[in-house]
Amino acid sequence: MSKIIVGDDGTIDPKSSERRPRRAAYALPTFFTAGNIFLGYVSVIQSFQGAMLAASGGVGAEPHFELAAKYIGLAVFLDGLDGRIARMTHTTSDFGRELDSLADVISFGIAPAVLAFAWGIQFLDPSIDAAIREQVVRFGYFFSFLFLLCGSARLARFNIQKNPIPKNPGRPDRKYFVGLAIPAGAGMVASVVYASGSSPIHYWPFAVAWLALLALLSFLMVSTWRYYSFKDINLQRPRSFLIAIGLGSLIYLIWNYSQPVLLGLASAYVASGIIIRIGGIVRRRLRPAPPARDAEHQVG
């Protein structure tokens, strides 16, 4: 029988044979995180390749932007898997958390920021007024960088918070994110590009609207508004077959109507935090004031 080496802190020494079968389990979530990084990298490459076609009038740029958006969407999917796999296999680690954060900066910060500028600003009609074009391009640099900066700040805030759940999370059996998660912001950018047929923006009013969306997403990521995290979904609970049916239906809709369905899902999720915030403000204003306790102020 092999000897189990136990350290002073009660953990099993890595040299012990008891730890060797666990190494493969630790590598599994890291494999998904590495895939996340790869998808972010190739998304940036595709955005660059599409942007280089601006000089030729944009002919042939659409396939590159479509792939860039799809790679971001696949990265969102992998990002949702690596954490769940680590928790299911009890292989969470500080290294895994840090690597996952760096992967998120690449796939959901840099990749969508580059795509947002290349698709939304790079192909403006050259016939528009030069002064307008110059200003739109300048704001394009600023707001695409702002998206990256706010997404990175969102990740940093999440990492340092011991309990990144709002003090008033609503129903106690549900978990919420504080602010829009950076994968959701990246998914919104990718879904708009994908739903448009990946045809880049040519008219400056549409480019201004695009920059306004980037500004909104940047604000939501660093806000303290509540967003449902979906982390409490458990298919092993009673009546979980209803969740399975819903997920199956959703997969069918995405498979057959991917462009409108993905855009609708991303838009609904982004809007959900705004609706929750507005609803909370309205409820507080409509809440009746507590009755004044006049008896305490009366002089006997």
Language model features: what each stretch is:
Residues 42-70, 114-142, 192-209, 256-260:
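Helix-coil boundary and interhelical linker segments in multi-pass alpha-helical membrane proteins
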Residues 1-18, 166-300:
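C-terminal membrane-associated helical module and adjoining short loops/tails
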